[in-house]
Every structure is written in structure tokens, then in C-alpha cells.
Amino acid sequence: MKMILLGPPGSGKGTQAKMLSERLGIPQISTGDMLRAAVKEGTPMGVKAKAKMDAGALVPDEVVVGIVRERLVKDDCDKGFILDGFPRTLPQADALKQTLGDLKKDLDAVISLEVDNDAVVGRVAGRRTCRDCGKMYHVEFDAPAVADKCDKCGGQLFQRDDDKEETIRKRLDVYAQQTAPLIAYYRADGLLRDIDGMKDISGVQQQILSALGCGL
């Protein structure tokens, strides 16, 4: 199963991708995680990505496409993969189509998680991240036992710039302008599956599995 998860920031793509990866036995490919690793390491690619991420804008295509292509040629993608957070623009979608054609890997489905913008802001602005181990919490839905302290390692929790309300709303605007057209792009290809992302995690997962014909 070769698939893409689409949806605005905070729509639950990462959570659903992880669950699907475990259920289907295929890798989750999160461009967000790969980009953050490059930023943390201070690589040339990471420096370019950081400036855009801090401003709530999209990372340049040449950076993201290069990362994704390198990942898709690995052996664990032979039976399938889940792209989480890519593509985000029509040029990226075209580049992905060309890459998959070169690798003889055709997409099976594109899942689009539909959510309310205000709900997204509430989900994302409540996130807190451990400075030491990177474990994530939510002040409402998954709070640590002791405020601002990681349950796992005792490290200090903080709110990433990416998770602040002003940045989130900018990212949602960027999504609407540049990423939402992908829905029409993949609908025209007959690959799109619309999913109600406002249900609970289990409910969303059940919808996705049903749309993929995988059973419950």
C-alpha cells in the first residue's frame, strides 16, 4: 500500500500515519521529522529549512524533494509507504509523480483529513515538547504529571515556535493557498479519499481503513 496523508497542520496526520504503519507493516515517512532533525544538526539543508519553518512558511521544494527521494529508494519502501506531510504543493506533487514513475511505484490512495481551523489551533497551541528527549505533551489532552516537566526524563517542557497561535494561523493560511489545491489534483486522478478528521483518533482510523478496503 503506497499512500499519502493530506491535511492542515494539527489535523492528526502524524498520529494516523503511525497507527497505519503499525497496522499495515509499512514505513511512515514524515518530512516534518526529517526536516527537524536536519535543523537540530545544523546541516546546510537544515539552516535553509529553519528560516522558513520559524516564519510559518513552507520549506523550499529542492530541500524536501531531495529528502523524500532518498527515503523512497530504501528497501523498506518496496512493499509500500505512508507519506506524512508531503507533497504540500502542486509542483511537489508533480515532482513526486515523476519520482514514483522513475521508481515504478504507483500511488494506491491519498487520504485527506478534513478539520475545522479553530479546532486545529486548539490542538496545536496546547502542545509542549521536552527540551531533552523530545517527548510531546498537550496541556489539555495529554498533560504531564508535573506542570512543565517531562514524565519520561524530567526535562523542561516548552512551546515550539511552530506551535504558537500566530504561527499556526500563518501556516493554515499557507496551507489553504498552496496545499489545498492538491485535493483537486488527486481527486482528478481518482486517488482521493475524504475523511472526517474531527472524530476521535480511533474513529478517524476506522474511516481510513474502510476507505482503503483494509477492514476494521
UniProtKB/Swiss-Prot annotation:
Q: Does the keyword Metal-binding apply?
A: yes
The residues that the entry says bind AMP are 31, 36, 57-59, 85-88, 92, 160, 171
For the region LID, give the residue spans: 126-163
Q: Which domain of life is it from?
A: Bacteria
Question: What processes does the entry annotate via GO biological process terms?
Answer: AMP salvage
**Residues that coordinate or bind ATP:** 10-15, 127, 199
Question: Subcellular localization, per the record?
Answer: Cytoplasm
**What top-level class of enzyme does the UniProt entry assign?**
transferase
Q: What Enzyme Commission number(s) does the record list for this chain?
A: 2.7.4.3
**What GO MF terms are annotated?**
adenylate kinase activity; ATP binding; zinc ion binding
The entry assigns this protein to a family as follows: Belongs to the adenylate kinase family.
Assembly and oligomerization: Monomer.
Present the record's domain note: Consists of three domains, a large central CORE domain and two small peripheral domains, NMPbind and LID, which undergo movements during catalysis. The LID domain closes over the site of phosphoryl transfer upon ATP binding. Assembling and dissambling the active center during each catalytic cycle provides an effective means to prevent ATP hydrolysis. Some bacteria have evolved a zinc-coordinating structure that stabilizes the LID domain.
Q: What is this protein called?
A: Adenylate kinase
The gene from which this protein is expressed is: adk
